Amino acid sequence: MSCLLIAASGTGGHLFPALAVAEALPESWKVSWLGVSDRLESSLIPKKYQLSTIGVEGVQSRGIKRIVQIFKLLAATGSVICLIRRNRIQIVLTTGGYIAVPAVLAAKLTGKKVILHESNAIPGKATRLLGRLCDKVALGWPPAKKKLPGCKVTVTGTPVRKSFLMKNKLPSWAPSGPGPLIVVIGGSQGAVGLNDMVRAVLPFLLDQGCRIVHITGKNAQSKIIHTNLVEQPFSDDIPGLLQNADLVISRSGAGALSEFAVCEVPAILVPYPYAADNHQECNAIYASQFGAALIVHQHEPEGKALRNALERLLKKNLSQADTVENLLNLMRKGMAKMAVRDAHIHLMSLLKEAS
């Protein structure tokens, strides 16, 4: 039996790729999970795997607070060392973020193999800091290589959960009818800027006969009531929505983009403007280079740039313009080219080599 510790915490972008790998592992593998008590994993992971939690945060402050953060990091590393020994862990897999620091340090101090997966087109701070300590750094996309000199890198793609690789029907609660289906994903925390931009163009889209599913996240719903509009804070039916959508409007996290790619759904991307190292902008640019997405910036006039992009993409659907192949079809092909459907297999191979 191989014993694996997965260190993944916080957002879906860190958790879901790790979950995709865990789902694909043979039953002979025993998986333990390392997370933080007040994050998404506390409600998601215990349903399937043994979850152990630690207190950890970035060392970014100054003065006394910085000293406290360093002591917390050392204590967290000690806790992970105890966990590795207690559960007889042989390999550590992490998807980056703050939790990667104590996980990688503990793995090296106990002589265990460690693999770090970086989804973004530009590697995060933890990946840049820890990459050389890892036995392998697996990348979602090739551009990240340039920022990781001296690391043992390999491009695997970013794993998506198996539900995205299966054929799914459109949920029965989604609006039905002939109009184009637009899915808006505000994210688990509720992307206020993105949601506000979308709400500014809702009347236009509904007047044109579009069907809209808006996953708002932790954000109040609009006051518009229409048979072609469904708003929900969360949904477990994202694979079915994406596979049957004509267009998705979303932030540009690497995990979400990987899901869009395997579902071959064209995207309008609104990068989160305050993301660390501007990584969402880099992700969006990478997708646009495949012709898979258009980029709209949040700082542009409210609703205007988004409406312009929508009018451009939906021209054939809205006005029946006589074109050989409309832009949405070309973008769908771009997403297909960007997709890596067997990323979980590549990562499993790395784990098996290390075991």
Swiss-Prot record:
It comes from Prochlorococcus marinus (strain MIT 9211). Its main location: membrane. It comes from the Bacteria. It is an enzyme of class 2 (transferase). GO terms for cellular component: plasma membrane. The lineage of its organism: Bacteria, Bacillati, Cyanobacteriota, Cyanophyceae, Synechococcales. UDP-N-acetyl-alpha-D-glucosamine binds at T11, G12, G13, N120, R161, S188, Q280. Cell wall formation. Catalyzes the transfer of a GlcNAc subunit on undecaprenyl-pyrophosphoryl-MurNAc-pentapeptide (lipid intermediate I) to form undecaprenyl-pyrophosphoryl-MurNAc-(pentapeptide)GlcNAc (lipid intermediate II). Keywords: Cell cycle, Cell division, Cell inner membrane, Cell membrane, Cell shape, Cell wall biogenesis/degradation, Glycosyltransferase, Membrane, Peptidoglycan synthesis, Transferase. It is a peripheral membrane protein. One of its GO terms (molecular function) is undecaprenyldiphospho-muramoylpentapeptide beta-N-acetylglucosaminyltransferase activity. This is UDP-N-acetylglucosamine--N-acetylmuramyl-(pentapeptide) pyrophosphoryl-undecaprenol N-acetylglucosamine transferase. Its EC number is 2.4.1.227. Pathway: Cell wall biogenesis; peptidoglycan biosynthesis. Signal peptide: none annotated. Belongs to the glycosyltransferase 28 family. MurG subfamily. One of its GO terms (biological process) is regulation of cell shape.
